[in-house]
Amino acid sequence: MEAPAPSLTEEDLTEVKKDALENLRVYLCEKIIAERHFDHLRAKKILSREDTEEISCRTSSRKRAGKLLDYLQENPRGLDTLVESIRREKTQSFLIQKITDEVLKLRNIKLEHLKGLKCSSCEPFAAGATNNLSRCNSDESNLSEKQRASTVMYHPEGESSTAPFFSMASSLNLPVLEVGRTENSSFSSATLPRPGDPGAPPLPPDLRLEEGGSCGNSSEMFLPLRSRALSRQ
């Protein structure tokens, strides 16, 4: 949707008319006869009696026209009233076209200036929004690249990450360890009878024979060694 075209305020139009009088000053001073417009300008309250007397004090027609333009520039309705007076005189109608063309030219310049200011005020915002969007996209891509790199570095393919591992250990392994620790403590606290103690079950015959044989063999092994040592002495 197109933005509405800028329009001139009353202050802008007053400035345009003032600039038009200034640009046409030399031309109008040569063409205008100030005394012909006194009556109409005084009737419209643009000039006072003292103003007309001040203008009449000038020695030449060009100076009187210049002083008249000074008063017209000070009044927002000065140029419009001068055009009305020229139209009433019907002797210098070509001045109306000259003044109108100058006003329209300055008006268009003013509009173009306002349009340029409006566009320049919008451009930084749009550029900033685009930069912010691109910056956000680049940040997101950089973050995803970093996450992907960390995943490849610390968690090779086929290996789960550490966070799920510890969460699984805390939820599954810890209860098992606690149960095992409880059972071990119960078994260690209970005292079992040794072989030969009252209440201990009898040994199997094979184990009794092996135990007896080992004792006999041990005595036989040491006695010859002791006798050999004595014989050498």
UniProtKB/Swiss-Prot annotation:
Name the reported effect of E53A.
Decreased interaction with CARD11
Question: One Gene Ontology cellular component annotation?
Answer: cytoplasmic microtubule
* Positions bearing N-acetylmethionine: M1
- Specify the superkingdom: Eukaryota
Q: Which tissues is this chain's protein expressed in?
A: Highly expressed in heart, brain, spleen, lung, liver, skeletal muscle, kidney and testis. Detected in developing brain, olfactory epithelium, tongue, whisker follicles, salivary gland, heart, lung, liver and intestinal epithelia of stage 15 embryos.
Q: Give the free-text PTM comment from the record.
A: Phosphorylated by IKBKB/IKKB. Ubiquitinated via both 'Lys-63'-linked and linear ('Met-1'-linked) polyubiquitin chains in response to T-cell receptor (TCR) activation. Ubiquitination is recognized by IKBKG/NEMO, the regulatory subunit of I-kappa-B kinase (IKK), and is required for TCR-induced NF-kappa-B activation. Linear ubiquitination at Lys-17, Lys-31 and Lys-63 is mediated by RNF31/HOIP; linear ubiquitination is recognized with much higher affinity than 'Lys-63'-linked ubiquitin by IKBKG/NEMO. CARD11 is required for linear ubiquitination by HOIP by promoting the targeting of BCL10 to RNF31/HOIP.
Does the UniProt entry include the keyword Transcription regulation? no
Effect after changing E50A: Decreased interaction with CARD11
Q: Give the sites of the cross-link named Glycyl lysine isopeptide (Lys-Gly) (interchain with G-Cter in ubiquitin).
A: K17, K31, K63
Q: Which intervals hold domain CARD?
A: 13-101
Annotated Gene Ontology MF terms? Answer: CARD domain binding; cysteine-type endopeptidase activator activity involved in apoptotic process; general transcription initiation factor binding; identical protein binding; kinase activator activity; NF-kappaB binding; protease binding; protein heterodimerization activity
Enumerate the residue ranges of region (Disordered): 185-233
SUPFAM superfamilies recorded for this chain? DEATH domain
- Cell wall biogenesis/degradation recorded as keyword: no
Regions of compositional bias (Pro residues) in chain numbering: 195-205
What the protein does?
Answer: Plays a key role in both adaptive and innate immune signaling by bridging CARD domain-containing proteins to immune activation. Acts by channeling adaptive and innate immune signaling downstream of CARD domain-containing proteins CARD9, CARD11 and CARD14 to activate NF-kappa-B and MAP kinase p38 (MAPK11, MAPK12, MAPK13 and/or MAPK14) pathways which stimulate expression of genes encoding pro-inflammatory cytokines and chemokines.
Question: Subunit info?
Answer: Homomultimer; homooligomerized following recruitment by CARD domain-containing proteins that form a nucleating helical template that recruits BCL10 via CARD-CARD interaction. Self-associates by CARD-CARD interaction and interacts with other CARD-proteins such as CARD9, CARD10, CARD11 and CARD14. Forms a complex with CARD14 and MALT1; resulting in the formation of a CBM (CARD14-BCL10-MALT1) complex. Forms a complex with CARD11 and MALT1; resulting in the formation of a CBM (CARD11-BCL10-MALT1) complex.
Q: Which protein are we looking at?
A: B-cell lymphoma/leukemia 10
Which species is listed as the source?
Mus musculus (Mouse)
